[in-house]
């Protein structure tokens, strides 16, 4: 897949996550397997979908599932309790998925490129060093000239 197609795929994923977060929904179970790509036969077109909302939680809801198994999920090491999950915890996972979409690899980009810096900021170990919103990631992605890969 071309670097530009990967970039388009990454942006579709980010717009989907921005849609959720702007409506007060945290996914809480992001993994490589929960990002689906539908390709259209006979064309270069594709559609990215985020799936598996079994652990998703709306802001302000007292209902939460805390004992569920999160097989394959990318779990934020800064998260003290699943009950305290916030958008910034999804952003940690977003960094890893964004990296995978753009490079095809699970190892995080550390090359100092603009896109590498975006990925590093998403997946910073300290949540205070991360993007505050998915929209902020989208804005920085728009400024990045060329995708990695």
Model region roles, listed by residue range:
Residues 20-40:
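Catalytic-loop of the protein kinase fold
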